[in-house]
Amino acid sequence: MEIGVNVPNFGPGTDPGRLRDWARTVEGLGFDLLMLSDHVAITPDVAEQYPAPFYEPFTALSWLAGITDTIRLGTTVLIAPYRHPLLVARMAANLNQLSGGRFVLGVGAGWARQEFEALGVDFAQRGELTDELLRTVRDAWTNDADYRSGDIPIWVGGLSTAGMRRAVRFGDAWHPLRQSMDWMRNALGVLAKIAENEQRALPAFSPRILLRLTPEPLDERVAGEGSIDQVIGDLNQLEALGAEAVVLDPFIGDPAETERPETAWSALATVMAHRGDK
């Protein structure tokens, strides 16, 4: 099972030097994936969770590709309705080629209503627009040589039944974000039923989970939260459930965290040290 990191490409203190330090730290610790989030307009609803500055993921990942060697690079997740499908197909193909085949395209439908309004995109149509993007990107990569650049895995986010159906229809992997172990275990059963009804192969399971280490175990928590033993237990359970990859998200929610990445780096190092003891 691969383990990746959702690197904060936003917030106070984030600049090219900080992104470079993140990339070198994550690759140096031996992680398999480095992934970035996506927002275009930092409207109030976005800023509450992801404050400015915000580095556009394709741009930032292209730069990070040049200062990393082997770590895979991806989006968790690109908000599909914000960009023309053919632009995404070309940017993804170009980035995959420039990085030596290391790109993973994670896609989601989005949630920030004010951001949709600022961009002139119909929030109510976000599911349909996401389906259309995935359909168009797949078609461009398959049928137009100008867009081809090796195999690019598509991870589809979404927690609803519609999101799971989208992952079955268009994705190489289903990429749920920040849920409990019980929720994911039950949802995998739903995903399998959807795949059966759609008469399609079951996509891989590649969740993104929180990473928050606490001195003592927690009773109520989501996956990736609690003592190091609890977090390692979650990773072991996810591996037993068949997870192909797990992305750790060390951003807890305090904007000041992006100014002090050393805490996150320490947590990531602790996880890798304990995983190495398996």
Name each model feature, range by range.
Residues 1-278:
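Active-site-adjacent structural elements that line small-molecule/cofactor binding pockets in enzymes
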